[in-house]
Amino acid sequence: MTMLGERLVLRWRVAASFAWSVILMPVCCALFIVLSRIQILHPIQWLTDSISDLTSSYTIFCLLLICAILGLQCTFLMEYYTVVPSIPCSRLALIGNLLLPHRILHSLAHVAMGVLASWCYAVLSKGKYQLLVVSCTLQSEDEADKPSHCLNESHLFQLLCGAFFGYSYSLQYFVHNMNYLSFPSIQQYKYLQFRRFLPLIIKQSVFQSLYFIRSYAILYFCLGNIPRTWIQTALNLHMDRQQPSLDTLRGFLNLSLFYQIWLSGTFLLATWYMVWILFRIYTTEARIFPVQTSFAEEAEKCLPFILNSNTLPLVKYLAMQDLVLLSQYSPSRRQEVFSLSQPGGHPHNWTSISKECLNLMSSLTSRLIAHQEAAANNGRMRVPSSPKQIRKSSSSSGTSLIEDSAEQTQNLSTIPRIGIPSLLKTASLKSSLDIGSPFATPGVKQMSESLDPNTPCHGSVQSPQVTRRGAKLWTSDSDVQKNGSEVSPVMHRPVCNGAKQGILHTWFQHKLVQIKNVLSKRGLIMYLFSKHPEASSQDVFADAQIHIWALEALSHLVAASFSEDRMGVVQTSLSSVLAILLTLQEAVEKHFKLPHASSKPARNPGSLLDSSCKTLRFSLRAALKTAIYRITTTFGEHLHAVPVSSEHKKKLQQFLDFKE
């Protein structure tokens, strides 16, 4: 599938979600007009006024403007979605993510959309909150009362409230990973999914609007005079002295205004949540990809090709989701996976699909092993590696387990070979430390006691190899030619200069440690820099959804091959499948023995916001164990004939005995 075709798949789904949002908007606007003009004592007049305003010109204009805002909302949803959630490890990292340029643009755009939406709701509600400039009468002692134009602070209050709602929604969008697309575990019709989310949308909008209004009221009470004075000066308007200012206690008692603000905020959030839910429902809808085709030009649209290509992440996730559904519910399509190519008789479909699934599981295993090694080495002294090794370790990811083990063996073999210059530098540092100097901090004294006194400055060395290299390291070429292998007396001057530099460097490092210790005792610094206990574990399994699908699809296909694979194409790779599954299972079990890895966060089933990204590691653990049991219960004792290692045979026997 070409890039243009991939974008068209996404655009058609976004267009469908936007179309349904536009269809539902007249109902939302009619409901808002009815609720904003509520008159319990005069119900007939209330209904007649509401019906007459539904067909007015300003209502249609506001409806079109709100639909345009929803179109912008869909555009931002399409540009900012992701299938892998972002897991910040600390609050400072979260703040850094929010300050990225494209996310600042998202916040500013939602501020503008919030102001426009609040203006539309103010116009739809009519009454005294409809206009920003109103007519008023100025009272003066010398002159008679004269008409003038005054600032309607209630309307300004509502516009600024819309800006606050837009910015708060944008912050929540990234803080709670609302841009993360979580695929449903159970396939349902789109109507049933939307009906299930509709009560949650209403509940979330109602209570969150109250929460936002509380925060906004406090902010306006403290800083409301700044935008009010600026607008008043820019438009050359006066203040109506007959109306109390809203940044006073008397102005806060206007319950009618707060009801209007709450109702506008509720509908603003409800429409945005509605667009967001429809976008999620349509983009995560299952799509059927052909397994094979008779035409060469359509090969790019087939499932094996998409799984092994660098396509859009969403399209690849949809392909893996289709593979899971294929492996469970479609025997005819499974036969296409097990089929052989004609001519040639090669299992290209099974090879491509199994290769991608095994690569995904191998990459996750490598990542888990690296995370466990980093956790084990946390706080320990490491042997410094060369820059080449550092670049190699930082750039390598997703390699096979055999290559990783070979590389670790090479690194371990190079550890004892410590360079001579590092030994000489340490020795010269020890000889130049003066305990009575002002730089001799307790850390320096402790270091001086722990170093070996046999250094070149003391006139003796430990190793003859160091003595042979002394002239080469510490003297010039002319000194070597004059004195031969003897060490020139001039060699002591560079040693002392290097020792002074070493003292300054050690003193500077010690001061940095002291500064860090002082800052770590500050509450605000600890609040920003303290890491979340579960963040590192959640980050390792951030993309575990596609690995869960790979496990389920591969295990279902292997289990189905026991009775459906007539050519035996799956049995040729059964040993590698079992080996990788058992290796991954061992790595996962070791990971859950780490601190905070097994602590499961509390889930709120009544919340609209999805928190499934925080529990993906538990889902993968259950899916992995289920996948192995699915294979062992299907093949039974036949697995003893599969060539695997002795450790894996013991592990398989535990699964066969249902002791795992």
Swiss-Prot record:
Record GO terms (molecular function): protein-macromolecule adaptor activity
Pfam families recorded: Ndc1_Nup
Compartments reported by the entry: Nucleus, Nuclear pore complex; Nucleus membrane
InterPro entries: Nucleoporin_prot_Ndc1/Nup
Domain of life: Eukaryota
GO BP terms: mRNA transport; nuclear pore organization; protein transport
Compositionally biased intervals (Low complexity): 385-403
Topology of this chain in the membrane: Multi-pass membrane protein
Region (Disordered): 375-408, 448-471
Task of the protein: Component of the nuclear pore complex (NPC), which plays a key role in de novo assembly and insertion of NPC in the nuclear envelope. Required for NPC and nuclear envelope assembly, possibly by forming a link between the nuclear envelope membrane and soluble nucleoporins, thereby anchoring the NPC in the membrane.
Family: Belongs to the NDC1 family.
Protein name: Nucleoporin NDC1
